[in-house]
Amino acid sequence: MTERENNVYKAKLAEQAERYDEMVEAMKKVASMDVELTVEERNLLSVAYKNVIGARRASWRIITSIEQKEENKGAEEKLEMIKTYRGQVEKELRDICSDILNVLEKHLIPCATSGESKVFYYKMKGDYHRYLAEFATGSDRKDAAENSLIAYKAASDIAMNDLPPTHPIRLGLALNFSVFYYEILNSPDRACRLAKAAFDDAIAELDTLSEESYKDSTLIMQLLRDNLTLWTSDMQAEEVDPNAGDGEPKEQIQDVEDQDVS
């Protein structure tokens, strides 16, 4: 086996063993060869990072939720411990995001030649800046949000020209970009417009849906519709009562990283 094949096989082994940190290392070696990745290699890289970041994002949400409960009780000593612990998780999140963003910037985006791979990588860039914006504050949050917006817009411009509306990567981009508008920019109107346009465009061209991407595309369309339903009901509730939902746990908004699709 060549070095490239060797690392791809290592990544597959690590995935089966659920050792995602090692999967990341193997696929980073492939990415650093400065070649255009195959669809399989690209998906392995995405799955590896999705799992290492996903575990920390879930931890951060749980810790933040506990922190809010303890704040309501006024438990100062516990709050100090929680803040320190949250800081550790945030450092891990920052390190993972800066790692993949570096790989994208130095190797993957410069070597991408097809429209599909460019959309895939710019979407990834938008996603990982969005993950930074989820927990950052002040100017760090502003910078992460701006970088995310620029990357998502670059991906969207290419997707509109090069990919059909039913393509799972174009649909996944629309899903995550709309979540960015809703959660990071607090712009439910734009989030709903983007999600609805992507869903409607895909419905109008359902006959172009290829057999191999049918499952992924229809799953993402369902997620777009689920988010639209959730967002419109939230917006209607706020119109009736501006304080609706304050202090209540919110239903989880779905993005494509929460699902088993790439």
Swiss-Prot record:
Protein's name in the database: 14-3-3 protein epsilon
**Which residue stretches belong to region Disordered?**
236-262
Q: Does the keyword Acyltransferase apply?
A: no
The source organism is Drosophila melanogaster
Question: What exactly does this protein do?
Answer: Positively regulates Ras-mediated pathways. Acts downstream or parallel to Raf, but upstream of nuclear factors in Ras signaling. Three mutants have been isolated, that suppress the rough eye phenotype caused by mutated Ras1 (sev-Ras1 v12). Inhibits yki activity by restricting its nuclear localization. Together with pav, has a role in the inhibition of microtubule sliding during neurite outgrowth.
Q: Which GO terms describe its molecular function?
A: molecular sequestering activity; phosphoserine residue binding; protein heterodimerization activity; transcription coactivator binding
Q: Which residues form a coiled coil?
A: none
Q: Which SMART domains match?
A: 14_3_3
Give the sites modified to Phosphoserine: S262
Phylogenetic classification of the source organism: Eukaryota, Metazoa, Ecdysozoa, Arthropoda, Hexapoda
Q: Which InterPro entries match?
A: 14-3-3, 14-3-3_CS, 14-3-3_dom_sf, 14-3-3_domain
Which GO terms of the cellular component aspect does the record hold?
Answer: centrosome; chromosome; cytoplasm; cytosol; germline ring canal; mitochondrion; nucleoplasm; nucleus
Q: GO annotations under biological process?
A: axon guidance; determination of adult lifespan; DNA damage checkpoint signaling; germ cell migration; germarium-derived oocyte fate determination; microtubule sliding; negative regulation of neuron projection arborization; oocyte microtubule cytoskeleton polarization
**Keyword vocabulary terms for this entry:** Phosphoprotein
Quick check: keyword Ribonucleoprotein in the entry?
Answer: no
CDD domains reported for this sequence: 14-3-3_epsilon
Into which family does the record put it?
Belongs to the 14-3-3 family.
The impact of changing E183K is: Suppressor of sev-Ras1 V12; subviable
**Subunit (UniProt):** Homodimer. Interacts with phosphorylated yki. Interacts with pav (when serine phosphorylated); the interaction is necessary for association of the complex pav-14-3-3epsilon complex to the microtubules, thereby inhibiting microtubule sliding.
- Pfam families listed in its UniProt record: 14-3-3
Which residues form each disulfide bond in the chain? none
Which gene is this protein's source?
Answer: 14-3-3epsilon
